Amino acid sequence: MEEYQVYLELDGYQQYDFLYPLLFREYIYALAHDYALNRSRISLENGTYDNKSSSLSVKRLITRMYQRIPLSISTNDSNQNQFFGHNNNLYSQMISEGFAVIVEIPFSLRLVSFLEGKEIEKSHNFQSIHSIFPFFEDKFSHLNYVLDVLIPHPIRPEILVQTLRYWVKDAPFLHLLRFFLHEYFNWNSLITRKKSISIFSKSNPRLFLFLYNSHVCEYESILLFLRNQSSHLRSTSSGIFLERIYFYRKVEHLVQVLANDFQDILWLFKDPFMHYVRYQGKSILASKDRPLVMNKWKYYLIHLWQWHFHMWSEPGRVHIKHFYKHSINCLGYLFSVRLNPLVVRSQMLENSFIIDNAMKKFDTTVPIIPLIGSLTKARFCNTLXHPISKPTRADSSDSHIIDRFVRICRNLSHYHSGSSKKKSLYRIKYILRLSCVKSLVRKHKNTVRAFLKRLGSEFVEEFLTEEEHVLSLIFPRASSTSRRLYRGRIWYLDIFCINDLVNHE
């Protein structure tokens, strides 16, 4: 990879047709199975390649796509449809993997070189989802209003292709990608008209997640540029995504015009307390400013999507919420800022005063209703949250069934360990524990009381989380101390993905 690094580096003011010649070289297809790119400390992918994605098959299929062989594909979404004489899902996944490898190579190299130039510490702890929550706790407790934004998604593949024009100045490759996306759009297997962010198929996540993120980064770069005009602490983590051809010239000209003619409008963007966070298909824009300014931001985002990115967005997709009156659903938690009244009695000479203070506290709770809905879909309980028996295989052993429920329970407890109120978490653990018992009772055709009597306390100990075991070992005689520490919020730096039950959105 080092010998190709100089060749693949992009110059923002020149045009390099780097992807087109690489499509016809042998080594580019082998990169799909080469882990040299993955051995770097920074990786842009969420998983590994499928062994079925043969580099030779990818090469042949891309070559036949260039030859424009007529396709005979029915309109029905079926796995039996033939794509170049082969199974649709299998070979479309091969092609998408080939596209993803080719597109990600220059961006991976530029990202690594960017981080080396900035001397940013490459710690794996920064990849943890829980590392975001201390930032919320430190910053959001001083803010007043928040924009809860549901990001619109492009329903036409042409919008995704146009987004890449700022990154890739290679017409043949863009035409090939456009042809591939339009064929998928006709099959209605990867891109659909659903409202959720799950418009991309789970079997082909890499390429389409890259396209979606690059599309969202287009409008985020504008927001970040305007945000940094008034901030002394410039953002560096997203600096690699801000490199656009003629982008800074356009925005600087826009800011100059606004500064000369519309001083009040420019003041909208000069907010040093503005914080932006994006997760899945939503984003949060929090500020300490007044509701009028937040309303301006709302309609600014809507017009930016509609007129600049050609995406229809309704005003109802952007909600203005007061932090002290509403909660924000983010990453499986409900965030809110609670005002705790504090009465202090002060005495000066013969006069005494009573001072009322309101202390702000950042509150994190478990969204019990959506989580019970996820347990209902997974058939752990009914709609009323009453535990039910989950069907199991006849040849499954009791230890295997218990280990499965214990693993689910510990993962949920591990992820929601930062909750300030553990009662909801205890209820979820109770549902899983009793569902496990009913599943075993159903298998052995016994009663719940008789089964629990036979297992005893060993069954309950299986569901204890790791932190409970550790605290009980540290404080064996001070049970109240360990109980108080466990009830507090605990953030972990080893959580890299959201559990399927937590990801109920």
UniProtKB/Swiss-Prot annotation:
A cellular component term, taken from the record's GO annotations: chloroplast
Localisation per UniProt entry: Plastid, Chloroplast
GO MF entries: RNA binding
InterPro entries found in the cross-reference section: Domain_X (IPR024937), Maturase_MatK (IPR002866), Maturase_MatK_N (IPR024942)
UniProt cross-references to Pfam families, sorted A to Z: Intron_maturas2 (PF01348), MatK_N (PF01824)
Keywords: Chloroplast, mRNA processing, Plastid, RNA-binding, tRNA processing
Keyword Nucleotide-binding: no
Protein's GO biological process: mRNA processing; RNA splicing; tRNA processing
Taxonomy, superkingdom: Eukaryota
Family statement: Belongs to the intron maturase 2 family. MatK subfamily.
Job of this protein: Usually encoded in the trnK tRNA gene intron. Probably assists in splicing its own and other chloroplast group II introns.
Protein name: Maturase K
Source organism per UniProt: Pleiogynium timoriense (Burdekin plum)
